[in-house]
């Protein structure tokens, strides 16, 4: 330090205040920076490009079911590492990491609640838990939810988002395709409606079983739906796939699903479908939500 700098007055600068974490969210599609409160009010749909941001199951069911009496079902059914499976990491360590990151015990949550006053059973997958994969506990939770619907003669709704069967459980995970299909056949015997909602992504063994067995199959816009992913298919057939292949709009155009519905309209749409399928009076919808 020279004599000149010693003569200069010291200038204090105000501490720079950072923006609190979680106030803003960047859209994964258009990269617009969105105010978190406004985004949540819009049900996690980007107001700029209408991209449907992935939801955890509790947030999804909180948006879907009426406030008030809600009962979680089958939460005591937990995953078990029967095969002592290990790839680059032990399966039990993967489970522990997923449980810590998501604060959930498994990749499926099941609730009994109401939709515009009408009781239903609803299930939702968690893509943030081991890719929403279906293992023995997921299949058992799903079956328990359907059995509860049968017992109380209620409609059943499932929101799927999954990479498929959980490879760390081997054949035990593949058994769940048959189990979930069989229990849904029982639901159909009682003439109780099953509404399947496909969200991004719904792939593999889940898409090949419970996801495509709905009396009405609905998809959120631009959801990736299929068995193998498009990159795997292109590498196998050595051809470029059509634009939009395996997206919900493509599947609707080719008759694989029944409807593509914006998330903000799902509750009113499903409520109307259920009343039609169960021969009940139309639900008392708010004016802005009427379909």
Swiss-Prot record:
Q: One GO term of the cellular component aspect?
A: acetate CoA-transferase complex
Alphabetically ordered keywords of this record: ATP-binding, Cytoplasm, Fatty acid biosynthesis, Fatty acid metabolism, Lipid biosynthesis, Lipid metabolism, Metal-binding, Nucleotide-binding, Transferase, Zinc, Zinc-finger
All disulfide bonds of the chain are: none
Q: Give the top-level enzyme category.
A: transferase
Q: Which HAMAP family does UniProt cross-reference here?
A: AcetylCoA_CT_beta (MF_01395)
Q: What does this protein do?
A: Component of the acetyl coenzyme A carboxylase (ACC) complex. Biotin carboxylase (BC) catalyzes the carboxylation of biotin on its carrier protein (BCCP) and then the CO(2) group is transferred by the transcarboxylase to acetyl-CoA to form malonyl-CoA.
UniProt family annotation? Belongs to the AccD/PCCB family.
Its name, as the record gives it, is Acetyl-coenzyme A carboxylase carboxyl transferase subunit beta
Native organism is: Coxiella burnetii (strain RSA 493 / Nine Mile phase I)
């Amino acid at each position: 330090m020279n004599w000149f700098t010693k003569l200069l007055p010291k200038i204090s600068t105000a501490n720079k205040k950072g923006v609190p974490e979680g106030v803003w969210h960047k859209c994964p599609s258009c990269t617009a920076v969105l105010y978190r409160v406004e985004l949540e009010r819009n049900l996690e749909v980007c107001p700029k490009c209408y991209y449907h941001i992935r939801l955890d199951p509790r947030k999804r069911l909180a948006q879907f079911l009426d406030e008030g009496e809600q009962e979680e079902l089958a939460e005591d059914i937990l995953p078990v590492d029967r095969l002592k499976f290990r790839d680059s990491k032990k399966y039990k360590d993967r489970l522990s990491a997923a449980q810590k990151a998501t604060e959930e015990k498994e990749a499926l949550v099941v609730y009994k609640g109401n939709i515009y006053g009408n009781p239903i059973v609803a299930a939702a997958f968690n893509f943030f838990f081991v890719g929403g994969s279906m293992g023995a506990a997921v299949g058992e939770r799903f079956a328990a939810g359907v059995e509860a619907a049968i017992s109380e003669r209620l409609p059943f709704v499932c929101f799927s988002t999954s990479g498929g069967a959980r490879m760390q459980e081997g054949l035990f995970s593949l058994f769940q395709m048959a189990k979930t299909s069989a229990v849904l056949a029982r639901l159909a015997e009682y003439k109780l409606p099953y509404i399947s909602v496909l969200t991004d992504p719904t792939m593999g063994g889940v898409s090949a079983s419970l996801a495509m067995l709905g009396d009405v199959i609905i998809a959120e816009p631009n959801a990736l739906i299929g068995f193998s992913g498009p990159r795997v298919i292109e590498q196998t057939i050595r051809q470029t796939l059509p634009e939009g292949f395996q997206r919900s709009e493509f599947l609707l155009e080719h008759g694989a699903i029944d409807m593509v519905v914006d998330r903000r309209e799902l509750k009113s749409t499903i409520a109307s479908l259920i009343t039609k399928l169960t021969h009940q009076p139309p639900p008392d919808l708010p004016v802005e939500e009427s379909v």
